[in-house]
């Protein structure tokens, strides 16, 4: 009981207790529904609830929570020339503006939850493979993908320096010979590289 009270006090010491609570619940609710949903709901309803909560968590983490808790935001810019790049917005861009400093509680809990949630989904993925639950594996891959993408983008945003572009590719596909129908494959490759 003391640990719950201490955690409650920690949340209250945050600069944005409501946003931090929404952020932590956004990471926890899909996991709880994944673990306990089959006891109360059909698998279809469980899938839908988990996917909707994951989508809401992705949106809120990307657009609201990161902006309020660590003063960073990212988006993926797709230009008309088949080039895609990350775009970042960070407190580092505005050193002259007297913005409120980042609360260490907000920062620690944001980054901890951002890295713990995908780790939990990866563990669930291994458990699905061991138990041969391939239908649930689809859900876990979706969940892990959304969480890992957010973690990866925020990691890049945190390391980003104003005036530089994000140039490290997510991964590089091997160079392929240019046959007639490989245009789609090269577009796929360009999706994972940033210019």
From Swiss-Prot:
Keywords: Golgi apparatus, Membrane, Transmembrane, Transmembrane helix. Golgi membrane protein involved in vesicular trafficking. GO terms for cellular component: Golgi membrane. PANTHER family: GOLGI APPARATUS MEMBRANE PROTEIN TVP23. It comes from Kluyveromyces lactis (strain ATCC 8585 / CBS 2359 / DSM 70799 / NBRC 1267 / NRRL Y-1140 / WM37). It is a multi-pass membrane protein. It is found in: Golgi apparatus membrane. GO terms for biological process: protein secretion; vesicle-mediated transport. The lineage of its organism: Eukaryota, Fungi, Dikarya, Ascomycota, Saccharomycotina. The keyword Metal-binding does not apply. The chain crosses the membrane at residues 12-34, 39-61, 109-128, 132-154. The gene is TVP23. The keyword tRNA-binding does not apply. This is Golgi apparatus membrane protein TVP23. Belongs to the TVP23 family.
């Amino acid at each position: 009981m003391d640990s719950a009270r201490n955690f409650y006090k920690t949340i209250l010491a945050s600069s944005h207790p409501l946003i931090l609570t929404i952020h932590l619940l956004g990471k926890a609710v899909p996991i709880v529904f994944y673990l306990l949903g089959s006891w109360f709901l059909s698998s279809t309803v469980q899938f839908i609830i988990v996917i909707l909560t994951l989508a809401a968590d992705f949106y809120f983490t990307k657009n609201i929570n990161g902006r309020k808790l660590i003063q960073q935001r990212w988006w993926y810019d797709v230009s008309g020339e088949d080039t895609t790049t990350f775009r970042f917005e960070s407190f580092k861009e505005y050193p002259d503006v007297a913005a409120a400093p980042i609360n260490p509680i907000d920062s620690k809990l944001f980054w901890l939850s951002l890295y713990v949630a995908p780790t939990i989904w990866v563990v669930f993925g291994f458990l699905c493979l061991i138990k041969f639950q391939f239908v649930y594996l689809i859900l876990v891959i979706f969940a892990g993908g959304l969480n890992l993408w957010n973690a990866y983008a925020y990691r890049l945003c945190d390391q980003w320096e104003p005036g530089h572009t994000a140039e490290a590719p997510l991964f590089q596909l091997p160079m392929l010979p240019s046959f007639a129908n490989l245009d789609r494959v090269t577009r796929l490759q360009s999706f994972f590289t940033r210019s």
